[in-house]
Regions:
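Cell-envelope/extracellular polymer assembly enzymes that use nucleotide-activated donors
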Residues: 13-15, 44
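Hydrophobic helical membrane-anchoring modules
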Residues: 2-13, 186-327
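Acceptor/aglycone-binding surface of glycosyltransferases and processive sugar-polymer synthases
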Residues: 76-78, 82-92, 106-190, 206-225
């Protein structure tokens, strides 16, 4: 199906977009907290169930039946990934601003309202939540630092600027970013391509309420690869520089060995040293071929129109949005 649909005029001030994966134990409390918020201009909740294997679907249907604010539940046909699910939510959100939260309750909804007000006051297109203390496992924090380092290097991002999954964007930016239908979206890279009106705000980060994170090391590596190759040819240029450096080193070594041979001096190199050098150069060649293959593979998959997401069904509550005008 076509993922891009006509975007209606904003009917609420703020949309909360929450991607869900096996969130049956956490989503109810989070939704009730969001419903109780006082948002001038009204707010809505968009839940995107990204192929959960537990009872998330049934819990969402129950929340929809008792919704106190406008609510939309979207079902993906299978698990496509967090960034894919967020883009699906952005395409259906009707707010003038959109905040996306994690499904585990670690992003307090009250902090989302602070982030929204900060974006309004500063005239920002994108406002990231900067966690004072992150309540993730050590390997997740290490992975986040690696992602920050790679985006500093590969993307047009101010060095050291903090990126996080807790962000507030304008409807304008969400609409522009949601126009991307590629199968390997990386939201922060897309946002940096659209606008430079970006800021951050220090926010609280809670401990996970229940369950375990849906992010595995494999998923984190896939995210790294998307950040690494989707928005820059810098890795290929680095491979070229590395190849030139090794070629120069090889010619230099050849000159040294030839000089030693001519003088009849120098160490007696055997098969061990020869095989070690061969393995080093072969390993470098395979790494470069793998990098080129990653680019070509992603191009092949994109050309063959692998879907970014497939929507199985949508359910919307019939409660009208608040009529109070935004301040």
């Amino acid at each position: 199906m076509n993922l891009i649909e006509p975007t209606p005029a904003p009917s609420v001030a703020l949309s909360f977009v929450i991607p869900l994966y096996n969130s049956a134990d956490t989503i109810a409390d989070l939704v009730r907290t969001i419903e109780s918020l006082d948002v001038p201009g009204g707010h809505e909740i968009v839940l995107v169930n990204d192929g959960s294997r537990d009872t998330t679907r049934e819990v969402c249907r129950g929340l929809l039946a008792q919704a106190r604010v406008p609510m939309l539940v979207i079902e993906h046909a299978r698990n496509f990934g967090e960034h894919n699910a967020v883009l699906t939510g952005w395409r259906h959100a009707r707010g003038a601003h959109i905040v996306n939260l994690d499904d585990d309750g670690q992003n307090p909804p009250e902090e989302a309202v602070r982030l929204w007000r900060h974006a309004q006051e500063r005239g920002l297109d994108v406002a990231f939540g900067h966690y004072l203390v992150k309540q993730h496992a050590a390997w997740r924090n290490w992975g986040s630092r690696m992602t920050t380092w790679m985006t500093d290097w590969a993307l047009d991002k101010p060095k050291g600027f903090y990126l996080s999954s807790f962000r507030c964007v304008t409807a304008f930016v969400a609409r522009e970013v949601a126009g991307n239908t590629g199968p390997f979206p990386y939201l922060d890279g897309l946002l940096l391509q659209v606008t430079q009106r970006i800021g951050s705000l220090e926010v609280k980060h809670r401990e996970r309420q229940a369950g375990a994170s849906g992010y595995t090391f494999r998923r984190l590596v896939r995210l790294w690869m998307s950040a690494f190759v989707n928005f820059s040819v810098m890795p290929l240029r680095l491979a070229t520089v590395l190849g030139l450096f090794l070629a120069a080193a090889g010619f230099l070594a050849l000159g040294v060995v030839s000089y030693w041979w001519w003088r009849g001096t120098g160490p007696a190199f055997g098969w061990g040293s020869l095989m070690a050098a061969f393995l080093v150069f072969s390993g470098v060649q395979l790494v470069i071929l793998g990098l080129v293959g990653e680019y070509l593979g992603r191009m092949f998959i994109t050309i063959n129109q692998r879907p970014q997401a497939v929507i199985r069904e949508r359910f919307r509550s019939d409660r009208p949005p608040s009529s109070e005008p935004p301040r």
